[in-house]
Amino acid sequence: MGTTIAGNPYLIQAAEYITPGLPYFAAIGIDDEDRHIRERVQTACETVGYAWPECRTTLLLLPTNQPKRPGLCALATAVCIMATAGTIGIPDLENTVILGDVEADGTIPPIGEDVDLTALIEHAREQGIQRVILPAADLAQAGRPDGVEIIGVENLNDLKR
């Protein structure tokens, strides 16, 4: 996923780990005031019919010391969790930037106009990213950069196999 600090774009790596244990969802690298993302993502995934893992689920957002905007990382969080179970119909997520929020009903709202999507996508392209997933409502703002596939989604179901 990507975000900006003072207008400078940078990428955030999202990694998901599912291990045996009691059901629990931990998010590392998110500020304490942004912890509500866990409940929103879990509710959204369950609403669209995804069975939440009955084990310990850990989301790691790197670098942990960089600030993250919850409105830009919730969709990436949901995609990571769904991908660990093989329910995502998009191959090679390692070369993909995922931007956006997710509502409790699974819909993907537009990214705020204060985010310079063109700069974020250009920075991602310069880092070798080949695909960007973002809200369908933001496709026009994203443009059509050379060498980057842009995928717009309206709902988490758009990503399921």
Q: Can you name each region flagged by the protein language model?
A:
Residues 1-161:
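Peripheral, non-AAA+ core regions of ATP-driven protein-machinery
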